[in-house]
């Protein structure tokens, strides 16, 4: 007969009918009892021939691929012009005085951030945009390309111009200015001969207004040649030939599209974004577009006498000028030929765009190192898209990078720190990752991009192949024409207009700010925000500021005080260049919602949406059916988050952990499901630890236990010898049960850790409930007053130690610590508290 739920509760000592704890609790460590209970509850994981269940509620397991949903109406989020103040340490010191060593070290880590992978694998451009949505390939291509363009315009990406130069938008940093090669320009007044000197260096420097000007007589690193003669049309801005002092008319920079022969003498060749694979590196691709240089003052400056009518120049263009514009001169192949689309506009705009600033970069191949694709911004916002960057090559294989570890505040640390009767609000940092600048030397390792529409479509279509590798073009221009492509492009034309042409060209971009797809980024963001919050805490010692990643919370004793603090802190953060989203500032009152918890003066509980997820999970959980271990992983992830708020905690989930480790199916018996259900439907807050003086001590030997409760000494023996850790845990349980003390001294590190998952299952569950809310203090064995009673010597009295317990915030980064805020609530349960049931010894 299977074990009933009520009988199981009695075995676990969760009911009041249990006998004396000193007799009942040691039985739970018995191997035979644990084995019999596991058999009765079907926890032994026998090999079952019944087919596994691969879906439970929202959890899917093996062999069930979730089809991602593409939204053709995704909006690309707008990104502010984020420019973190370069001299951020001095700005902070002006605000708060000298910074600590820890704060300086962390701020220096991100100004600029550096990235040193062991090795970098370069992938072909076709893998730049992942075919994540097979039914919406073209739409996804343009949406992703638009997202990348938006990031570049906002100054978060570099655009690779040539092998050794890149352009970007936004304000430059000093480490980027240092990479400029040659003299600076000073607006439109010096756009004549000196402008071409700059182009001859292959850098195309364009600094902002007011930047320092080097003397035009000063020698650049290129030597005097580049400043003594104007740039001829045949001279190419290729860094390799410039260093050699030779300008070859036959060698052109890879990825450059020079204009046709009619303009060859008028325009200096400039890098464009027509980037193909290495097989075509030496091929020249004529550029059709009219170049307009925008000076730092914002005026368009046309070079020499170039016609501004792109239509006129396009008609005399060679055959390989631009894949998109070739359709203009070709005969339509069908009703769905792209010629119809291209002829809708006279002026499709330039083939490529260039940033405001051009810098030298380390040698960067025409490849990508990671793929990108779009997903919903979050489960609650499906109208906007989010760019997912896959740089997983740096986290896999023999050359994987060991990312630095950093402290994640655990539940008890968070509760100790934030559980008070303060009034709270949380700040929303806009695009937090894109605040932290990367050194340009990291660009060759963090490359994203696309191969251009023609190659992308050809790669994904079954009847089109890229045969002419020499020119990287299709053997027949109209091979790519199809009804699906035509319809998709016509619909996209309404959204993107003439940008369809720009986005159809190849492009390679490197990250200028830290990307989200690299394990280094969370570490850097955590260091940065923790240092900033430390500065805020020192500036406002009567308040509390805390952050985890981009989640920043402020606490003050009154709402009026909090609003004043909010204004001051916001102004300080804005002065550093940190962008906040005021529309997403949330005022929480006295119950803070943070990291999935609700934290108030009574302690912490999971947020309501997590509780609802757990209820939904139990409603869908089948009994007596083997469930795929992959599904169990999802269930354990959800239940594990709320485990500290239950009676038996993590030990109750150990059968599921075991099944996942052995990659076996797990079958829920009705009793085990009812047990877990009861556990998770009654959640108890995790309370804030309070400082105190330890008056109760416990110790044990394999054969006996001893307690020291004030001046009282107790001892007892076990029926059979037990492992020492098990004996020490039993002694701690007896001390808690007999004294009711929430502070116990012990010399056992396993008991101190409060992790009871390695003990016999029944004992771990019962001990977790008995010791819930108990704090432990380490006492050396030689000084432990309970040491003698545990060895059977009651007559010897060692003096009680004055051991003070101070609640800790763990390894959480708190350099400037706010004074603790005493709770004004009495120790008894407040009428508004969700804590309805106080702990009773079993």
Swiss-Prot record:
Enzyme Commission no: 2.7.7.7, 2.7.7.49, 3.1.26.4
Catalyzed reactions: DNA(n) + a 2'-deoxyribonucleoside 5'-triphosphate = DNA(n+1) + diphosphate; Endonucleolytic cleavage to 5'-phosphomonoester
Whether Amino-acid biosynthesis counts among this entry's keywords is: no
Q: Where is the Reverse transcriptase domain?
A: 356-599
Identify the stretch(es) annotated as Disordered.
Answer: 205-271
Residues flagged as site, Priming of reverse-transcription by covalently linking the first nucleotide of the (-)DNA: 63
The protein in question is named: Protein P
According to its UniProt entry, this protein's organism is: Hepatitis B virus genotype E subtype ayw4 (isolate Kou)
